[in-house]
């Protein structure tokens, strides 16, 4: 599983869930499956973070939380450089997406922005971080053909610059077919 914005980062950084077919993985992990090299990076901005913080303070007196300050994705040039020396990435799975992918409309933010004026700027940083990752992979000539993400709770697909970007809705699945025709 890739870390979402409503997920406790420690479950992923410490790989607390490790089952045969389901596990939490740290950001910048590489999964090799069906002949693909898949880069996984989680995180995104929670537009409802003020609500979550107030709710946690009122109802989660034991210290449990539903918001984490380190929820956003981060760009790590050193890790991407090291990955580029070792392996070629053909598929990317992230929680959010580059700025040129849907969801581009900011219509749903106005109510949340009234409660948290930093939301628009943080959403911009969030998407620009994905832009940096995209540009790094392109500049390093990784043969990326697929990029999957969720976060926006909608479905959308489009090919952009030779990459099929797929935004997945809640409980939507996509099959990444084997890159080996004999399989």
Predicted features along the sequence, with ranges:
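Core catalytic region of metal-dependent phosphoesterases/phosphodiesterases
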Residues: 1-33, 111-119, 123-129, 139
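Short, glycine/charged-enriched secondary-structure capping and boundary segments
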Residues: 14-17, 53-55, 106-109, 161-164
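Active-site-proximal loop/helix segment associated with metal-binding centers of metalloenzymes
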Residues: 34-128
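Generic beta-sheet signal
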Residues: 2-4, 41, 168
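Binuclear metal-dependent phosphoesterase catalytic core
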Residues: 32-34, 121, 131-140, 152-183
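Active-site donor-binding loop signature of nucleotide-sugar glycosyltransferases
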Residues: 27, 43, 168-170
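Active-site environment of divalent metal-dependent phosphoester hydrolases
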Residues: 2-13, 31, 46-51, 98-103, ...
């Amino acid at each position: 599983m890739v870390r979402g914005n409503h997920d406790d980062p420690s479950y992923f950084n410490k790989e607390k869930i490790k089952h045969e077919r389901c596990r939490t993985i740290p950001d910048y992990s590489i999964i090799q499956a069906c002949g693909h090299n898949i880069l996984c990076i989680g995180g995104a901005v929670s537009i409802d973070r003020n609500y979550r913080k107030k709710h946690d303070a009122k109802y989660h007196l034991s210290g449990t939380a539903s918001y984490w300050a380190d929820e956003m994705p981060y760009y790590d040039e050193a890790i991407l450089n090291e990955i580029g020396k070792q392996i070629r990435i053909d598929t990317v799975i992230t929680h959010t997406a580059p700025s040129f992918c849907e969801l581009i409309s900011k219509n749903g933010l106005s109510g949340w922005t009234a409660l948290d004026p930093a939301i628009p700027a943080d959403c911009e940083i969030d998407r620009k971080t994905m832009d940096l990752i995209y540009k790094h992979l392109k500049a390093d000539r990784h043969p990326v053909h697929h990029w999957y993400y969720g976060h926006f709770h909608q479905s959308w697909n489009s090919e952009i610059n030779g990459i099929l970007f797929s935004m997945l809705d809640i409980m939507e699945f996509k099959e990444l077919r084997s890159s080996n025709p004999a399989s």
